[in-house]
Amino acid sequence: MEFDNSFEVPLPPDRAWPVLMNVQGIAPCMPGAQLTEMVDDKSYKGNIAVRLGPVALTFAGLVTFEDIDNANHTARVRAQGTDAKGRGSAQAAATFRLEPSSTGSKVLVHTNLTLSGAVAQYGRGVGMIQATASALMNQFANNLKKQLVNPPDPAAVDTAVKPISATSLAGLVVWNSIKDKLGGKS
């Protein structure tokens, strides 16, 4: 399945791009994500914990930057992971790019996601997958904005992996529906 997400950051593209390319720096902004190993300068191993409805899943996998165009602020990333309990796998190909905006930069993300095994059954409703992806992206964007405005003290960073909760997901789905009806205004 394919879906698109976007968010804004308070930096112009030339300053936002290096921040987004610093995977180790932004990984803590992604809810439920944890880097476990830097394989090389373009590949990273890690885990991500998510909920699809009532089912908690933890995927261990590899993220690889396949194409990076620093001049045009675009990148293509491939991720693949397997559920820790053997319930299936996920593969994603994502492209993202930065565009100038009135507040700094708009980050546009296009994702093609494939789920297999029991995991595909848990998330068979496309709406649930899109809502989960949107909720993760919204939380990532909010965490990234906070980090850009007030960089954390490295000693105070909480590294515990917490999956996005069903309550948070439901709240974000309702909020996004309201925003869509109001024309995307927050």
What are these model-predicted stretches?
Residues D67, G81-T132:
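Beta-strand/loop substructures that line and gate deep hydrophobic ligand-binding cavities in soluble
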Residues N5-F7, A33-Q34, A60-D67, A92-P100:
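Hydrophobic/aromatic beta-strand elements that line small-molecule binding cavities or substrate pockets
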Residues M1-G53, T159-S186:
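Hydrophobic ligand-binding cavity/cleft-lining segments
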Residues E2-E8, S43-K45, T58-A60, T74, ...:
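Intrinsic-disorder/low-complexity, polar/charged segments enriched in Ser/Thr/Lys/Arg/Asp/Glu/Gln
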Residues A16-L20, I26, F65, V109, ...:
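Hydrophobic pocket/interface hotspot
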Residues M38-T82:
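Glycine-rich portal/gate segments that line the openings of hydrophobic small-molecule binding cavities
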Residues A120-V157:
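A conserved amphipathic terminal alpha-helix motif
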Residues P12, D41, N70-A71, S101-G104:
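Short strand-connecting beta-turns/loops that link adjacent beta-strands
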